[in-house]
Amino acid sequence: MLAVGATLCLLSFLTGATGRLAPDDLCYAEPRKTGPMPRSKPKHQPLLFEAPKVALTAESKGCQLILLDPPIDMGYRLEDKINASIAWFFDFGNCRMPIAYREYYDCVGNAIPSPETCDGYSFTLVKTEGVVEFTIVNMSLLLQPGIYDSGSFIYSALLDMDVLTGRVILNVENDTNYPCGMTHGLTADGNINVDETTHTTPHPRAVGCFPELINFDAWENVTFEEMGIPDPNSFLDDESDYPNTMDCYSWDLYTYPKSLKQAEGPQTLLIGAVGLRILAQAWKFVENETYSQHTRTYTRDAKEVDVTQPSPVQADSVLAKKRTSMKNNPIYSEGKPHAKPFSTIDSIHTEGMKNNPVYSESLMLNVQHSDSITTGGVLHGLQDCDNQLKTVYICLALIGLAHVP
């Protein structure tokens, strides 16, 4: 009887869920530089110490912001100080692509390593494609999944001398009938066949994370180095200098991943950078639907609010004809853009923009018709940006605004 009970316990551990909705206080897009600051660059590189032996599952839908948690039990450990590290990878089958890596130093031995429970932590290595899609929160991976993020995420944790390696199989609902579009993800540039479905059944659209609109100059004093974003001057003008999306390696090849960039900002800043990516993406609004509407409802009830879309026919009709006033929106006031006209982009003075991820007059909320979203989302859109656009987020904004009537 004990053997049967032990077997059932083991099976439940191997198939349990380890993904969860991110707490509401992680859904923000302003640049917060609070809490402990990182100490220096990591001393080591992210490694897969062994093949994962634990497989867990996670679910995501709509615009949800989620945390993938490694199942780490610190309760049995002593309080003696330890060093720790966490690496996250995506498993493409024939190779594993590194996504994020961080080291912690002199941590309380029986607490989850974090900037608050450790005496110090390293800069975070993050995979970037001009925007911050992922970051580490303590030992967990934070992201807003698209339908092309379904797949196997691998964690590799080191707690002093103890190695914990496993995989989290993320299942993203392939319904794209949400304001955030959903057509982005790690496999968007590959040959993965995903059905981009728009469900006919009415369901809430305000599902997930809708960061409060921010002042357009909020990120003015944040550098590319703090966010781990390559200076657009270095890769928009020369595509060959930009890391390959599929930079990954097999189990027996431990080469330093070029696609990981060093983000020197604190954990709170990188969380905001993920929120900024959410805010800057191309949005799909239906008639009489606005972003500020979802921001208000999300603030009141961050789980699900009944703002439904009756049918895909209405979704594909036209952008909202009457937009409500969005006084805090750097783009729209009564539906009119504040940004400089496209014809004047060439004359934008860029001398002070070289280390600024968001040009102070051009942080925009992207709005598109639902039929203008293409597979791959912002990753594909970046390839169409003019070389004169020296800021990634102004580039994203123009992609979206180019489709607004």
Curated annotation (Swiss-Prot):
Any Pfam family matching the protein: Herpes_glycop_D
Sugar-modified residues: N83, N138, N174, N221, N288
Domain of life from the UniProt record: Viruses
Record carries keyword Membrane: yes
Example of a GO cellular component annotation carried by this entry: viral envelope
Subcellular location: Virion membrane
UniProt topology in membrane: Single-pass type I membrane protein
Primary location recorded for the protein, binned into one broad class: virion
Membrane-spanning segments: 389-405
Sorted UniProt keywords: Glycoprotein, Membrane, Signal, Transmembrane, Transmembrane helix, Viral envelope protein, Virion
Signal peptide segment: 1-19
Family: Belongs to the alphaherpesvirinae glycoprotein G family.
Known function: Chemokine-binding protein that inhibits neutrophils' chemotaxis.
Protein name per Swiss-Prot or TrEMBL: Envelope glycoprotein G
Organism: Equine herpesvirus 4 (strain 1942) (EHV-4)
Upper lineage: Viruses, Duplodnaviria, Heunggongvirae, Peploviricota, Herviviricetes
UniProt gene name: gG
